[in-house]
Regions:
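Active-site metal-binding loops of divalent metal-dependent hydrolases
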Residues: 76, 100, 130-131
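Compositionally biased, intrinsically disordered or flexible polar/acidic segments
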Residues: 77-78, 239
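N-terminal secretory targeting modules
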Residues: 1-71, 78-79, 83, 88, ...
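Short hydrophobic segments within beta-strands
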Residues: 73-74, 166
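A short beta-strand-loop structural module common to alpha/beta enzyme folds
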Residues: 93-104
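Short substrate-entry loop that stabilizes the transition state in hydrolases
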Residues: 80, 104-105
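Alpha-helical cap/lid subdomain in secreted, periplasmic
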Residues: 87-94, 109-260
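Conserved beta-strand elements of the Class I
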Residues: 71-73, 96
Length: 260
């Protein structure tokens, strides 16, 4: 893991230098290049993005008596859940969104304490792993992803937090309007998605956790994400989140009653 982290930092450093030195072209103004360089520098200084929710976390009060607070830990699929055009993130519920777009399980594990444990929820819903498969922070293995998920689950349980492990969503290849395809199934192998989901289901059963199965409700007859549930073959659209909402709510209630 140290080698992967070091490699990621080196790549980010090289990216910053390249962007800073690159000449402006027709589509890339100096301002655009500076913005991209600033983003890369921020990632270099804060690889797990601990700063993303730092201020928000300080404003979260201790849970009220009998409050059933839930934290959703995840990547862009969680991050985008409360976007204005997605139908709302469980309105009226004491649910906290701590998703960060593009993140892998390694990054989530580092920020698990400030973004989950310190908020003192009753339940955490973990949806993670698709960006690991895509290699967002470097090459990885199923064993490494599983290890990070186990570590998050163990940290939660050690702090009295019930755990819901959510399946990865299926993916599908998507053709943009200009004809350029987004080949999601190459970056995120359907076979590996199924293998990781199978492991999660078994791990949850063995350890008395709740397994939240989004996959079965969102996959088509060919094993891909249903076209009507996504606009890019990866992220849910409003219809996709409409499928996920009741499944998540049912899993949370089951965890509060029966999970550990």
């Amino acid at each position: 893991m140290f080698r992967l982290l070091s490699a990621s930092l080196v790549l980010l450093f090289l990216t910053i230098n390249a962007l800073a030195q690159a000449p402006a072209t027709g589509s890339d103004s100096c301002a655009e290049l500076k913005t991209r360089a600033d983003r890369a520098e921020t990632r270099l200084k804060d690889w797990p993005q601990l700063s993303r929710y730092h201020d928000d976390n300080t404003k979260v009060n201790p849970p009220a008596k009998n409050e059933q607070r839930v934290v959703f830990m995840g990547d862009s699929i969680t991050d985008g859940w409360d976007a204005p055009n997605m139908g709302g993130f469980f309105p009226g519920k004491p649910y906290v969104n701590r998703g960060i777009s593009g993140q892998t399980t390694s990054q989530m594990l580092i920020r698990f304490r400030p973004d989950v444990i310190d908020l003192k929820p009753k339940v955490v819903v973990i949806l993670a792993g698709t960006n690991d498969l895509a290699g967002n922070t470097g090459p990885t293995t199923l064993d490494a992803i599983q290890g990070n998920l186990i570590s998050m689950a163990e940290l939660a349980r050690a702090n009295g937090i019930r755990v819901v492990l959510a399946s990865l969503l299926p993916v599908s290849d998507y053709e943009m309007r200009d004809g350029k395809p987004i080949v999601q199934t190459v970056r995120r192998s359907p076979d590996k998605i199924i293998a990781l989901n199978t492991w999660m289901k078994n791990y949850a059963a063995t350890n008395h956790l709740i397994y939240l199965d989004y996959f079965s409700a969102m996959v088509d007859g060919k094993g891909f994400l249903k076209d009507e549930l996504s606009n890019d073959g990866l992220h849910p659209n409003a219809a996709g989140y409409a499928v996920m909402n009741p499944l998540a709510e049912a899993a949370i209630q089951s965890s509060l009653k029966h999970g550990k």
